[in-house]
């Protein structure tokens, strides 16, 4: 019997009536009664997600900036000030995606940074950090003592500030992809995985339950992994292991914007493989699919286009659109606005759309 890991919020989940499930070895809420209600709370009001299974790693050393310029495909030289965040792929030598992560610059001297990476990939991420880090003499401090809570939705910040009014100036000054150290191991960033405004709060594990319950009392809806998935799907955001993996290039997964090739003198892990793929030509591209009626789109369904076959990588019923949606990879030279998907052996018509489907509560297509 495998003992599941628990987060600092575990007691709060139990007290809130969560249905707990195994997610990558962690016991986490799938919902607290109604996945649909939780989804709608984030689109119209405020919801919160325990994301403490994600790994926070503090990196320090005189060569920390050079280390990150080698480690990831995006370039930390763009982090112009303390607290600025950068989204990037972490690549292997073949140009496949080990993980996607966020890096924060945490001091003026560019000698300290913070990584937030996915929970399901923490072992291979950590192995890659250490492998690349050897030549740079940097230190790694995995912050197992911290919890992390995403507070998301159009009223998320308003409700957060009823609990933490002293944060008002800091939080109101944060633009998307900026974070701030609030002292005593509290950190807040204007980031998220829902397509709505909001923040992610990193905090001491010992203070997690009290913070969760205070937000709950302020009207923030606890949300589980089910709503997290439907929200990120509507927002057209990739899920590691579905929409990209060790054998998928970021250029094939809608992540080309996270690859920075401007500084030709910078070498990073996977760069040679990416350049070779660009030279050869990327065979597929990422699109969104919208099913007209009947059936549900799921991962690994065959997509039929006039330029050849593709495949869905994620699929779900969208609570906001009341239709089934999918993220898919299709032939690069396909530019039609309709295709077909095989559902239980039968062809179903789908619209082909540019991602995202929904952003800030609004449908993004006609």
Curated annotation (Swiss-Prot):
Q: Which Gene Ontology terms describe the biological processes this protein takes part in?
A: glycine decarboxylation via glycine cleavage system
Record's keyword terms, sorted: Aminotransferase, Transferase
The record's PANTHER family line, in alphabetical order, gives: AMINOMETHYLTRANSFERASE, AMINOMETHYLTRANSFERASE, MITOCHONDRIAL
* Protein known as: Aminomethyltransferase
Q: Species name for this entry?
A: Neisseria meningitidis serogroup A / serotype 4A (strain DSM 15465 / Z2491)
Question: What assembly does the database describe for this protein?
Answer: The glycine cleavage system is composed of four proteins: P, T, L and H.
Instruction: State the protein's purpose.
Output: The glycine cleavage system catalyzes the degradation of glycine.
Say which enzyme class the record assigns: transferase
Transferase found in the keyword field:
yes
- Looking at the record's lineage, which domain of life comes first? Bacteria
User: Per its UniProt record, what Gene3D superfamilies does this chain match?
Assistant: Aminomethyltransferase beta-barrel domains, Aminomethyltransferase fragment, Probable tRNA modification gtpase trme, domain 1
Per the record, its GO cellular-component terms are: cytosol; glycine cleavage complex
Q: Which Pfam families match?
A: GCV_T, GCV_T_C
What reaction does this enzyme carry out catalytically? N(6)-[(R)-S(8)-aminomethyldihydrolipoyl]-L-lysyl-[protein] + (6S)-5,6,7,8-tetrahydrofolate = N(6)-[(R)-dihydrolipoyl]-L-lysyl-[protein] + (6R)-5,10-methylene-5,6,7,8-tetrahydrofolate + NH4(+)
Q: Which family does the record assign?
A: Belongs to the GcvT family.
Q: What is its EC number?
A: 2.1.2.10
For this UniProt entry, the molecular function terms from Gene Ontology, in alphabetical order, are:
aminomethyltransferase activity; transaminase activity
């Amino acid at each position: 019997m495998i003992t599941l890991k628990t987060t600092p919020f575990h007691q709060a989940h139990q007290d809130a009536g969560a249905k707990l499930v195994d997610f990558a070895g962690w016991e986490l809420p799938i919902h607290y009664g109604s996945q649909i209600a939780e989804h709608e709370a984030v689109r119209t009001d405020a919801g919160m997600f325990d994301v403490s299974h994600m790994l926070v790693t503090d990196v320090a050393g005189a060569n920390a900036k050079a280390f990150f310029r080698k480690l990831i495909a995006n370039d930390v030289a763009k982090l112009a000030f303390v607290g600025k965040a950068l989204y990037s792929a972490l690549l292997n030598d073949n140009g496949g995606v080990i993980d996607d992560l966020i890096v924060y610059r945490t001091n003026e001297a560019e000698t300290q940074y913070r990584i937030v990476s996915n929970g399901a990939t923490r072992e291979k991420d950590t192995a890659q950090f250490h492998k690349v880090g050897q030549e740079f003499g940097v230190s790694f401090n995995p912050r197992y003592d911290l919890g992390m809570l995403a507070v998301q939705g159009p009223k998320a910040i308003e409700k957060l500030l009823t609990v933490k009014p002293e944060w008002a100036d800091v939080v109101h000054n944060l633009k998307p992809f900026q974070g701030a150290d609030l002292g005593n191991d509290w950190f807040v960033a204007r980031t998220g995985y829902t397509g709505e405004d909001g923040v992610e709060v990193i905090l001491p594990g010992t203070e997690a339950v009290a913070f969760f319950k205070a937000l709950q009392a302020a009207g923030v809806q606890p949300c589980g992994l089910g709503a997290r998935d439907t929200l990120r799907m509507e927002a057209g955001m990739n899920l590691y292991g579905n929409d990209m993996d060790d054998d998928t290039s970021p250029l094939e997964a809608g992540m080309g914007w996270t690859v920075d090739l401007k500084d030709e003198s910078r070498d990073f892990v996977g760069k040679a493989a990416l350049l070779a793929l660009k030279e050869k030509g990327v065979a597929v591209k990422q699109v969104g699919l919208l099913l007209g009626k009947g059936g549900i789109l799921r991962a690994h369904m065959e997509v039929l286009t006039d330029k050849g076959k593709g495949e869905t990588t994620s699929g779900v019923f969208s609570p906001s659109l009341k239709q089934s949606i999918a993220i898919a990879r299709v032939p690069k030279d396909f530019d039609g606005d309709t295709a077909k998907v095989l559902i239980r052996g039968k062809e179903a018509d789908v619209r082909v759309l540019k991602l995202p489907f929904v952003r800030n509560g609004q449908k993004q297509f006609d």
